From Swiss-Prot:
GO terms for cellular component: DNA-directed RNA polymerase complex; primosome complex. The lineage of its organism: Archaea, Methanobacteriati, Methanobacteriota, Methanomada group, Methanobacteria. It comes from Methanothermobacter thermautotrophicus (strain ATCC 29096 / DSM 1053 / JCM 10044 / NBRC 100330 / Delta H) (Methanobacterium thermoautotrophicum). The gene is priS. Keywords: DNA replication, DNA-directed RNA polymerase, Magnesium, Manganese, Metal-binding, Nucleotidyltransferase, Primosome, Transcription, Transferase. This is DNA primase small subunit PriS. Disulfide bonds: none annotated. One of its GO terms (biological process) is DNA replication, synthesis of primer.
Length: 323
């Protein structure tokens, strides 16, 4: 295991929160409504059993963190009138969770996380942010490096009061998790068009996500209703995808097999994100600025996802001082 991905000791946690962490580094979208959020803490690495915590101001939170130096710190995506009871729900952020260690398709073979799968998770996040902005017209979007992946947090007013069902539909669109429509009619005759022939809307979204999956297949993955032979054929010929020669790729796979591959990829796309996080209106998420003690990485807001490198920006000082 690489040094920065080793668990933090209690002494290292104490050093981080007393010497490096600063409550003023909290993102504004959390600091501005601190008193409306529920906080939760994991003190021993067994999960956030210390729940229903509320902090009226940054000073009280800072005092708690420095005294307790928790294994993990979380805050709710929901805003409450009475957060100490988790009652009086008002609204919730729209969340997308991409965890590098849980990606069903990734080109590395590590047991947890490594620079390769973290970068592939970042690629997914960039595509998602582009879709949220370009297709859905959303703008109040924050990307958070969680320590083992990324959280995309959306605070546009029009999505904050949505229920779980609508959030699930947004997830399916953004993830490319629906099989794209192939059959169309002009009122007189019907015809078929593949997703790569329609460079707009959901078909464009799906094509981008399918490209990501196909370019990162190792060749040993199980894709529903697709043979291992077809998966290997896709891997051998993915240079066609790189060159945007989708029609030739479809011919190599086989016109009758290709729709099954598309359907299988749509199911994989759904598993590239944790759907439970998106639909849970009362979820607690790792607190930006806090330490992910399992991997000794800092959970932090990412100002520029295009150039962000967690191995340069999210490593606490104590990691460099390990023997």
């Amino acid at each position: 295991m690489m040094p920065m991905f080793e668990p933090a000791t209690p002494l290292e946690r104490k050093r981080y929160y007393r010497e490096e962490w600063n409550v003023r580094d909290l993102p504004d979208f959390i600091a501005d409504n601190l008193h409306m959020r529920e906080f939760g803490f994991d003190h021993n690495g067994r999960g956030p059993s210390d729940r229903y915590r509320v902090f009226r101001d940054e000073r009280s939170l800072a005092r708690f963190m420095r005294v307790r130096y928790p294994f993990a710190a979380y805050s709710s995506v929901a805003f409450y009138r009475e957060p100490w009871k988790r009652k009086g729900w008002q609204r919730s952020e729209l969340i997308f969770d991409v965890d590098a260690k849980d990606l069903p398709v990734r080109s590395c073979e590590c047991d947890g996380v490594c620079p390769t799968c973290l970068d592939e998770a970042r690629e997914l996040v960039l595509m998602m942010v582009d879709t949220l902005k370009g297709d859905l017209g959303l703008g109040d979007i924050h990307v958070i490096y969680s320590g083992r992946g990324y959280h995309v947090r959306v605070l546009d007013p029009e999505v904050m009061e949505l229920g779980s069902e609508v959030r699930a539909e947004i997830l399916r669109y953004t993830a490319g998790a629906r099989e794209p429509r192939r059959k169309f009619t002009d009122g007189v005759s019907s015809y078929e068009m593949e997703h790569f022939s329609i460079p707009l809307g959901y078909h464009r979204v799906f094509t981008e996500r399918a490209r990501h999956v196909l370019l990162h297949l190792r060749g040993d993955e199980d894709i529903e209703d697709v043979t291992a032979r077809t998966v290997k054929t896709a891997v051998r010929n993915r240079n066609l995808i790189l060159e945007d020669r989708w029609g030739e790729f479809r011919s190599v796979i086989g016109p009758r097999v290709y729709p099954r591959l598309v359907k299988g990829i749509s199911k994989i796309n759904m598993r590239m994100l944790d759907a439970k996080v998106t639909i849970d209106l009362k979820r607690i998420l790792r607190l930006p600025t806090s330490l992910h003690s399992k991997v000794s990485m800092i959970c932090m807001e990412v100002k520029n996802p295009e150039t962000f490198d967690p191995l340069k920006s999210a490593v606490p000082r104590f990691v460099d001082e390990r023997e």
